[in-house]
């Protein structure tokens, strides 16, 4: 089955986890940024999971170097443009790129300049390729609460101009949602859609709280609802979409293999799952690769994929007009 030619939608892709290695090297040389190696084959080991990874925290260490080259307007625009260029080549028709603006203030940029630069790269790619992109702003859970309020407030002016949603990301502790009730209340009042990283690192109850306390409309990962009956029931009853990233989940040791990943069980039980990369460079993956792995190890069929694609259309934070266009591509999903 040729998954490459099929239309695709990406709802969970981190900008700083999806840089081209060549771009990291090019910017580092241009801006005199020290790297542990300027040899491409050696540098890959610092930014990608090549063989093994022991935990989510170890996985997150791979973002240190990419963020060093994402501190100027020019570089942010270029990296956003290249991401859309790369996924368009994989026949992705719509992507929601997520990133945390406060990771890019090291050289004095303010939040507005950072968001503007990424949006400029997205819009430039839209002009050249058959793709539409929107932006999700991330609040880092390892930063303080005032910083989350700052992102929500300063990003609000871009709602309707390419920014569609707010997210909470980084390492996951039990019962984190309770800390962010007021932040997400403000986000909802501002007009942001809400997606929350939860249930990625072993705590299914976090999904329950993200929905009940934070009004999450979508859940990033969410795979550990399998260990929390109450969360599973709520996700199914409320038809909450899960942004599932199988290869990333293997890398963070959430699961040992594709065969033991609950993705297909969720799909067969009517949970609204979508398929995503999480981080194309860190996990050395594409949507096509994700589909090929699920086909090879879990028996994903073309009929299954059509359900996944339409799930992603419905779950997206795209405009009604864009959703209609995306729905029309479903006719191309044939073996």
From Swiss-Prot:
Substrate binds at residues 14, 16. It catalyses: adenosine + H2O + H(+) = inosine + NH4(+); 2'-deoxyadenosine + H2O + H(+) = 2'-deoxyinosine + NH4(+). It comes from the Bacteria. GO terms for cellular component: cytosol. GO terms for biological process: adenosine catabolic process; hypoxanthine salvage; inosine biosynthetic process; nucleotide metabolic process; purine ribonucleoside monophosphate biosynthetic process. Zn(2+) binds at residues 12, 14, 197, 278. Keywords: Hydrolase, Metal-binding, Nucleotide metabolism, Zinc. The active site is at residue 200. CDD domains: ADA (cd01320). Its cofactor is Zn(2+). The record marks 221 as: Important for catalytic activity. Its EC number is 3.5.4.4. Binds 1 zinc ion per subunit. SUPFAM superfamilies: Metallo-dependent hydrolases. GO terms for molecular function: 2'-deoxyadenosine deaminase activity; adenosine deaminase activity; zinc ion binding. HAMAP family: A_deaminase (MF_00540). PANTHER family: ADENOSINE DEAMINASE. Catalyzes the hydrolytic deamination of adenosine and 2-deoxyadenosine. Belongs to the metallo-dependent hydrolases superfamily. Adenosine and AMP deaminases family. Adenosine deaminase subfamily. This is Adenosine deaminase. It comes from Clostridium botulinum (strain Hall / ATCC 3502 / NCTC 13319 / Type A). The gene is add.
């Amino acid at each position: 089955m040729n998954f490459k030619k099929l239309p695709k939608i990406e709802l969970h892709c981190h900008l700083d986890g999806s840089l081209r290695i060549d771009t990291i090297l090019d910017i580092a040389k241009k801006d005199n940024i020290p790297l542990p190696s300027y040899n491409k084959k050696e540098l890959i080991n610092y930014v990608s999971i090549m063989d093994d990874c022991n935990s989510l925290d170890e996985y997150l260490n791979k973002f240190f170097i990419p963020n060093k080259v994402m501190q100027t307007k020019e570089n942010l625009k270029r990296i956003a443009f290249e991401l859309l260029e790369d996924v368009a080549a994989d026949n992705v028709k719509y992507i929601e790129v997520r990133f945390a603006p406060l990771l890019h203030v090291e050289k004095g940029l303010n939040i507005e300049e950072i968001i503007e630069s990424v949006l400029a790269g997205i819009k430039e790619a839209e002009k050249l390729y058959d793709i539409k992109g929107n932006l999700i702003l991330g609040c880092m859970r390892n930063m303080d609460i005032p910083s989350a309020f700052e992102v929500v407030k300063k990003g609000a002016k871009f709602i309707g101009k390419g920014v569609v949603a707010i997210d909470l990301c980084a390492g996951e502790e039990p019962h984190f949602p309770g800390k962010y009730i007021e932040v997400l209340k403000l986000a909802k009042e501002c007009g942001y859609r809400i997606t929350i990283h939860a249930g990625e690192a072993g705590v299914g109850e976090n999904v329950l709280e993200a929905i009940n306390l934070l009004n999450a409309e979508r859940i990033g990962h969410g795979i550990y609802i399998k260990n929390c009956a109450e969360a599973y029931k709520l996700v199914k009853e409320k038809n909450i979409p899960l942004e599932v990233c199988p290869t990333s989940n293997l890398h963070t040791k959430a699961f040992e293999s594709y065969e033991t990943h609950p993705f297909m069980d969720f799909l067969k039980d009517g949970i609204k799952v979508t398929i995503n990369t999480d981080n194309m460079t860190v996990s050395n993956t594409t949507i096509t690769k994700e589909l090929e792995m699920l086909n090879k190890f879990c028996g994903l069929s073309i009929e299954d994929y059509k359900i996944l694609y339409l799930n992603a259309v419905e779950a997206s934070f795209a405009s009604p007009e864009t959703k209609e266009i995306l729905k029309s591509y479903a006719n191309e999903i044939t073996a």
